[in-house]
């Protein structure tokens, strides 16, 4: 996962971890764990919501969530 790219997109949209966590309906701690790949991953539905919130292209989604 490319957490730097996700964080930069969040910043461009003025979102904090709390803003995105609230939008996804998860706790801020859960979001941090997912971003830091600390034992949990983003679910497909969460990725879809992030794509919609930030108007991401399919390539951007691939770069953020599926990059090694």
Give the label of every model feature segment:
Residues 13-18, 43-46:
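Short, charged amphipathic recognition helices of the HTH superfamily
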Residues 17, 28-29, 58:
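The DNA-contacting recognition helix of HTH DNA-binding domains
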Residues 7, 32-33, 62:
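Key DNA-contacting residues within the recognition helix of helix-turn-helix
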Residues 61-68:
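Short amphipathic recognition helices of helix-turn-helix/homeodomain-type DNA-binding modules
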Residues 19-21, 50:
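Short alpha-helical "recognition helix" segments of helix-turn-helix
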Residues 26-41:
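Recognition helix of helix-turn-helix/homeodomain-like DNA-binding domains
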Residues 1-16, 23:
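A short, Lys/Arg-rich alpha-helix, primarily the initiator
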Residues 45-60:
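DNA major-groove recognition helix of helix-turn-helix/homeodomain DNA-binding modules
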């Amino acid at each position: 996962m490319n957490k730097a790219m996700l964080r930069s997109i969040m910043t461009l949209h003025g979102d904090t971890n709390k803003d995105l966590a609230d939008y996804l309906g998860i706790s801020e701690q859960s979001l941090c764990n997912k971003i830091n790949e600390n034992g949990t991953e983003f679910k497909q539905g969460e990725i879809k919501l992030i794509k919609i919130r930030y108007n991401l292209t399919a390539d951007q989604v691939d770069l953020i969530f599926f990059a090694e």
